[in-house]
Design a protein with these regions (language model features):
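ABC-family P-loop ATPase nucleotide-binding domain
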Residues: 1-24, 229-245
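ABC family nucleotide-binding domain
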Residues: 14-223
């Protein structure tokens, strides 16, 4: 039985609790309101898509959830930890031990093999999986000893995903993970994310402007102009192979 199925037998626990979150940037004499009172939850084992156009506040929200940025006002908690009151060291430890990040660009170390790129994380994690196990989860068992230059874009992104999950995070935050890929390659990457969510029960948030990707989520959170405008539940989820764009 997978970890996700075990969780499903219990009442879903809240991983993130967000209330009235705002973020304002000062750009010279101009104030830019990236978030204008966002409220949401993310639950254990859930896959959520944060959907909206460029400038809607998706990346800002994800960065605050991941401890990469702080809110101007409002409240955000990871389980029972109030991140709005966390010190810099507490946020560093939170990012290091609890959150996995996947970005549009892979940021692999060119002089290291796929296995070695993943090991960079596992060597400092508290309870890591083996690099080989992480790479196997994303379908790269036979590419572990290849360098980034020997891998396709989709394969490099899957190495980045393996690196993110290798520390056994409770949360996986993905910022436009298919943004630099064609649709066929992007679907393979989404299949890796779906497998991780299903088999490991890792709460997963994917931000995208691609409406089609929303079909694979448990819930879709729509953002517009810094506000969460709508939340939809997918009663029937699509598999990545059913997505087209």
């Amino acid at each position: 039985m997978t970890r996700k199925k075990l969780h499903a037998e219990k009442t879903a626990q809240i991983v993130f609790h967000v209330r009235d979150l705002t973020k304002t940037y000062q750009m010279g004499e101009v104030q830019v309101h990236a978030l204008r009172g966002a409220s949401m939850e993310l639950y254990e084992s859930e896959m959520v898509v944060l959907l909206g156009p460029s400038g809607s506040g998706k990346s800002t929200l994800l960065n605050i959830l991941g401890g990469l940025d702080t809110a101007t006002s409002g409240y955000v908690a990871y389980r029972d930890k109030d991140l709005t009151k966390a010190s810099e060291q507490e946020l560093t430890d939170y990012r290091r031990f609890h959150v996995g990040f996947v970005f549009q660009f892979y940021n692999l170390i060119s002089s290291l093999t796929a296995r070695e790129n993943v090991a960079v994380v596992t060597e400092i994690a508290k309870n890591p999986m083996l690099p080989e196990d992480a790479l196997s989860l994303v379908g790269l068992t036979d590419r572990m000893d290849h360098f980034p230059a020997q891998l396709s874009g989709g394969e490099q992104q899957r190495v980045a995903i393996a690196r993110a999950i290798s520390k056994n995070p409770q949360v996986l935050l993905c910022d436009e993970p298919t943004g630099a890929l064609d649709s066929e390659t992007g679907i393979v990457v989404l299949e890796s994310l779906e497998r991780i969510n299903s088999e490991l029960g890792t709460a997963t948030a994917i931000i995208t402007h691609n409406v089609d990707i929303a079909g694979m989520a448990d819930r879709v959170i729509h953002l517009s102009n810094g506000i969460i405008s709508e939340v939809n539940v997918n009663k029937i989820k699509k598999s990545p192979s059913e997505l087209h764009w």
